[in-house]
Amino acid sequence: MALTITDANAKEIIASGKPVIIDFWATWCGPCMAMGPIVDDLAAEYEGRVVIGKYNVDEEGDLAAEHRIMSIPTFLFFKNGEKTAIRLAGSQSRETFKAKIEELLAL
């Protein structure tokens, strides 16, 4: 299961030393809801190696504004406390998402 990320805990999670992926989503977003099971499945598969978390843009807002999230779902990838060039937007296949996780781990 993916971790819940909020404005209050985001900086600490990003700075944790582990690679981090943040899923910016909302309950009314069909593609976001379709990605939910994939995100949760990959969070379990990569547990201990990558932190995968969900950030609800309707309940929070500062982190989304800081990273200029204009559409959802958007997935940002962080390593060593810094945002990487890896980014996914829109609905993605499990295989595509997993390939990006492997790319993050290889950085």
Where are the language model's segments positioned?
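Short pre-active-site segment immediately N-terminal to redox-active cysteine/selenocysteine motifs
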Residues: 17-18, 25-28, 71
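A short beta-strand-turn-helix
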Residues: 3-19
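Structural cue for short, hydrophobic secondary-structure segments
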Residues: 23-25, 77
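Thiol-based oxidoreductase modules, predominantly thioredoxin-like and allied folds used
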Residues: 5, 24, 36-43, 47-62
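Non-catalytic, surface beta->alpha helical segment in thiol-disulfide oxidoreductase systems
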Residues: 77-107
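The canonical Cys-X-X-Cys-His
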Residues: 29-32, 75
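Structural micro-motif
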Residues: 61, 67-76
